[in-house]
Structures are given as structure tokens and as C-alpha cells.
Amino acid sequence: MSKNCAIVVAAGKGTRMNTDINKQFINLKGNPILYYTLKKFQDNTSIDNIVLVLSKDEIGYCVENVLKKYHLDKVTHIVEGGKTRQESVISGLNAVKDSEIVLIHDGARPFIEDRIIEDGIKYAKLYGASACGVKVKDTIKVIAEDGFSKDTLKREELFSVQTPQCFKYDLILNCHKKALKDNIEVTDDTSVVESYGHRVYLYEGSYNNIKITTPEDLPMGESILENIKTC
């Protein structure tokens, strides 16, 4: 039976949050943000194990205050993140063992749904690469250097990509290695495989699947969590 591994990337410092603590460890309704993220993969029966990518100086804290405290035993490997997200993902990929599909997910994106996880695995098996996201609601403009609007993009052609981004393991590992060798810098993992001619299937995510990045995101996160609990 093929195995599926979630790589949860939580090594970023989150400087936009303006706190002394990493954003993944900020409490949301009494529990760390990272707990909610890991718990979704822990409880999903399609996920066999989790590789967690952390900053070196936060590994001990996370083990004691998140993994042991909440009994998150699907986390089989903890690896040290790199200077960039790209380096952190490669570290996570190198720790994966015997998995056909990997799901790369932001540690600060705690409202992932089972349906999104299942669809990501399904489409990655079919097409090699998949990513969830949502249609853009606002009008998007291209801004010129002088501050004036240069162009208006067609909203119906735009898609705000989220995580997890899901791949056949060999495909994403080989593309990341090539990108590192070729000095190609990317902002997400779908861009890595696209750089080498591979198509990515985009499927429906959720507007609740937000990434908590700034202080303004915390009240929204609390509201989403409250709604989830009452459903």
C-alpha cells in the first residue's frame, strides 16, 4: 500500500507578527496554532506520518509543549529548517521515507479540512502535482513603479493558492534538487515543478484555510475556530 507523508513547515520566524514568540506557538483559544495544524494531519486516516520542519532553537520547546503535551505521535521526524523556506522544504523532503505522496503544508495554516487533504492526495496520484486554493474575490491590478495602475487582470483567471501542495515524492524531490543547483528561487512548491515543465492541478480549497501571518489574522482565526467548534 502506498504511503502519504505530510511535511509541515514551521521554521519561519514570522517577523510580521511583531511578537517575541514564533507565530506557530501563539495561542488561539488556549492552544498553539501549530497544535491545530498538526492535529488535522494526526487525525486524518490517509496520512501515515508527519515530518515537522522547525528552527533549530525551537525544536526542544516544540517537543515538550506541543508534541508530547498533545500526544502527536504521527510526527516521526523533526528536522532543522534552512535560511529560506525552499531550504526548509528540501530538509523535510530528505527526511521522508517510503512515501509515494507528500503534502507540503504551512505550519501557520491551522484550518485545513479533511476534504482538502483527501482531494490533494487523489489529484497528486492522478497528475503528479496538485494544490488547493480559492477564486480571487477582489479586483487585482498591476502597479507601476510610479504608483499608478498599469493593468487590470481578469479576475476569473486568478486563483489564490493555499497549502497543502501535494506531489509524487520523486517528482518534487528531483525538481527541488534541480532548482537548488540552478539557483532558481521560488515562493512556493508548485513553482518548483512548473519551472521544469510539469503541470499542477488546481482544486477547491477553502476561504477558512487562512495562513495566520499578521496580528490582524488572529481575530479572524479565533472566529473561524469558534465556527468550526459550533458546527
Swiss-Prot record:
Similarity field: Belongs to the IspD/TarI cytidylyltransferase family. IspD subfamily.
Keywords: Isoprene biosynthesis, Nucleotidyltransferase, Transferase
UniProt site (Transition state stabilizer): 16, 23
EC number(s) per entry: 2.7.7.60
The protein, known as: 2-C-methyl-D-erythritol 4-phosphate cytidylyltransferase
Record GO biological process: isopentenyl diphosphate biosynthetic process, methylerythritol 4-phosphate pathway
Gene that specifies this protein: ispD
Molecular function (Gene Ontology), one example: 2-C-methyl-D-erythritol 4-phosphate cytidylyltransferase activity
